[in-house]
């Protein structure tokens, strides 16, 4: 068993890895921290992503479902058919294979915890 407290999760950008604004990311900066070490779970990945105002992922899909938990900020999650506003406390389930994006609007930052099946493959669908 492993307990992770939010106070033990690195919250300053200096303690997180910069994902940049290229590749899957667009807009301003996105920051990342893996919460589980690679040997902690054979089944899941568990990390936090912090989006500066105006940053988002490009459209993409995963071979496994993705769960997003919003611990702070205001953001959006969109598919080919709809865009939802997300706020602190929201939980979003993105089914495997669903084309989507997630990120922060121009005016505010947003962070989300991401939980995925280990080995899930991400395919970027937006240039």
Give, region by region, the residue ranges found by the protein language model:
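A short, N-terminal "cap"/entry segment at the start of jelly-roll beta-barrel domains
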Residues: 1-43, 123-127
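Short beta-strand His + acidic residue motifs that chelate non-heme Fe in jelly-roll/DSBH
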Residues: 57-59, 77-78, 99-106
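Conserved short histidine dyad/triad with adjacent acidic residue
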Residues: 45-62, 96
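Ligand-binding loop in jelly-roll beta-barrel domains
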Residues: 40, 96-121
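Short acidic-glycine-tyrosine-enriched beta hairpin
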Residues: 81-97
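Glycine- and acidic-residue-biased ligand/ion/polar-headgroup-sensing regions
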Residues: 63-75, 80
């Amino acid at each position: 068993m492993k307990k992770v407290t939010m106070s033990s999760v690195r919250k300053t950008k200096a303690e997180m890895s910069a994902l940049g604004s290229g590749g899957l990311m667009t807009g301003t900066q996105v920051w990342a921290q893996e919460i589980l070490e690679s040997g902690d779970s054979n089944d899941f990945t568990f990390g936090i992503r912090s989006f500066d105002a105006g940053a988002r992922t490009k459209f993409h899909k995963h071979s496994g479902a993705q769960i997003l938990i919003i611990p702070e900020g205001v953001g959006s999650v969109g598919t080919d058919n709809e865009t939802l506003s997300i706020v602190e406390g929201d939980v979003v389930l993105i089914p495997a294979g669903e084309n989507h994006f997630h990120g922060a609007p121009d005016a505010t930052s947003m962070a989300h915890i991401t939980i995925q099946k280990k080995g899930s493959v991400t395919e970027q669908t937006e240039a």
